[in-house]
């Protein structure tokens, strides 16, 4: 009886200790945390270690790996791996680790038999309670590269085979991030694991955010109102909150920012429509900016805008000397009729590349559609280019 009582006491202590550890341990699991059969492709979710926007503080973010059914079953060797930079999202349900539809960039690109690796990024997935640090170029590219390399290692651990070919893809916000990935690779970030990029296909990217701001201020109108609060909040965050939302947004609009953007419960269509209906014209999809921003916004020399303008230039890609010398080729896709990310962004990027001695690029500007519909065309354009792409020296493989 004494032995049974002693055994019960020991087991009770062990159980209490185990529960205490479970209650106090909130460290996220590193590695694969989910596998989903999406029909035409598979999605593997994983958590990985990276650093915060300051470049120093260790954090954990979530990401996804996408592969075709044949690659997943190991019937074929993948052609290579693509780093996919996600486009603008505001609802956590839009994150890469929640994608299941073939009618998505992830679904289309993974069925090219390249494996795609895409980070949820700041502010989504496992990091959903924080600011998404919108268009903070260097910081976003860094976590995207870290996700790509962590994902490739997991694929190796899982026994998947793929050619040593690296793609860099993205549209809209992903175009900006993709160009920043080219820049970090050129600077040698993790060069022992990622010495170069074989092919970059990006589209609709805000490469020159300062000129974009100037156009918005001069026109005093937006046809995609969700973008401006995201851009300004991203630059305010980049500046360490020396500027406050109240310094640039009207008092009436400020009251809605937290619910619209911080909650991560509303997608871009919902937010656009909310702003149109309350402050603009829902019929012709236009918004007079003066209805949501203060006069200081229109004066780049005003105190709040001085700091914001500094960070707009800092996170653009055309205001200091550099070239994507470790990216073999870049194909751009941008519509001259883009009402969200004006074509001036593409023109500035082209001038910058030529001025810095990089000519291994081409530009497709044949689309006559706006930003969103051109995004669909970008997906088809990229799929076609990938089907025809033969990396240098791999003619016998492809």
Feature locations, PLM:
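Alpha/beta-hydrolase active-site loop
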Residues: 134-156
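Catalytic-loop region of hydrolases
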Residues: 22-77
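Short beta-strand/loop motif that positions the catalytic acidic residue
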Residues: 331-338
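Conserved alpha/beta-hydrolase "acid-adjacent" motif
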Residues: 339-345
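Accessory cap/linker subdomain of secreted extracellular hydrolases
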Residues: 203-322
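Short, surface-exposed "cap/lid" segments of acyl-processing enzymes
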Residues: 60, 70-108
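Histidine-bearing beta->alpha loop at or near hydrolase active sites
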Residues: 337, 358, 362-385
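Primarily recognizes the serine-hydrolase "nucleophile elbow" in alpha/beta-hydrolase
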Residues: 149-223
């Amino acid at each position: 009886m004494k032995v049974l009582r002693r055994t019960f006491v020991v087991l009770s202590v062990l159980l209490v200790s185990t529960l205490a550890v479970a209650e106090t341990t909130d460290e996220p699991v590193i590695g694969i945390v989910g596998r989903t059969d999406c029909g035409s492709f598979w999605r593997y979710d994983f958590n990985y270690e990276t650093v915060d926007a300051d470049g120093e503080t260790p954090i954990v973010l979530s990401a996804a790996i996408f592969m075709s059914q044949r690659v997943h079953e190991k019937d074929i060797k993948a052609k290579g791996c693509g780093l996919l930079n996600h486009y603008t999202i505001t609802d956590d349900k839009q994150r890469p680790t929640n994608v299941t539809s073939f009618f998505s960039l992830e679904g289309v690109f993974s069925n090219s038999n390249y494996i795609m690796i895409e980070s949820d990024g700041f502010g989504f997935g496992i990091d959903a309670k924080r600011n998404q640090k919108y268009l903070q170029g260097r910081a976003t590219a860094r976590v995207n590269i870290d996700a790509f390399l962590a994902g490739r290692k997991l694929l190796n651990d899982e026994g998947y085979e793929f050619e040593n070919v690296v793609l860099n893809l993205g549209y809209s916000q992903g175009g900006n991030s993709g160009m920043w990935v080219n820049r970090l690779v050129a600077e040698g970030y993790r060069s022992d694991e990622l010495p170069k990029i074989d092919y970059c296909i990006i589209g609709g990217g805000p490469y020159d955010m300062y000129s974009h701001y100037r156009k918005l201020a001069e026109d005093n109108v937006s046809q995609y109102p969700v973008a401006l609060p995201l851009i300004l909040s991203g630059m305010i965050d980049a500046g360490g909150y020396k500027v406050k939302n109240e310094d640039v947004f009207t008092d009436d609009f400020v009251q809605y920012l937290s619910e619209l953007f911080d909650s991560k419960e509303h997608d871009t269509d919902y937010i656009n429509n909310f702003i149109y209906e309350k402050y603009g014209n829902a019929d012709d999809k236009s918004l007079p900016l003066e209805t949501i921003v203060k006069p200081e916004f229109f004066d780049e020399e005003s105190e709040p805008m001085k700091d914001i303008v500094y960070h707009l230039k800092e996170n653009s890609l055309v205001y200091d000397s550099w070239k994507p010398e470790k990216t073999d080729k870049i194909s751009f896709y941008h519509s001259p009729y883009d009402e969200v990310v004006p074509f001036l962004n593409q023109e500035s990027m082209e001038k910058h590349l030529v001025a810095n001695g990089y000519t291994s690029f081409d530009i497709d500007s044949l689309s006559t559609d706006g930003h969103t519909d051109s995004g669909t065309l970008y997906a088809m354009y990229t799929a076609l280019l990938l089907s025809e792409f033969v990396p240098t020296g791999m003619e016998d493989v492809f």
